[in-house]
Amino acid sequence: IAPVAGLMGETTYQTCNSIHAMPIVHLHGVQDDVIYIDGGPEYLPLEDNGSTEGVVTYWKNINQCNEFKEQSIQQGQDTSIGTLGIWSNCRDGVEINYWKLDEVGHEWQSKGDGDDAVNVPSVIWEFLSRFTIDGAKIES
């Protein structure tokens, strides 16, 4: 799945029973003032927040991911525009990629240049095309 500036509501969180490991690429702007990255009255936060488990952590646990690394998202050689958290070594070879974009609000990024931090359609396709319903594609 590939949510962009979306969070998981309490009802979904309480009733979700995924039978498959789920590859997830999530992109969210830190400046989003519509669906706050830290959650809100109807939505869970994306990351752990006190005693409330975050959405990414929820899926990391379902997918049984064992490795994590974080890297800077660069625009050009000298400008960091956010961070990319990558959870890997997960069940069925799936991954979770969490793009946290510093100067982005609640808008769709598409060009990858100028005011658009990343080309979201390309990021989504490059990620999801690596998987099937059963997990990671086997390279031939």
How should each PLM-predicted stretch be described?
Residues 1-140:
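Flexible, surface-exposed loop/gating regions in the mature catalytic domains
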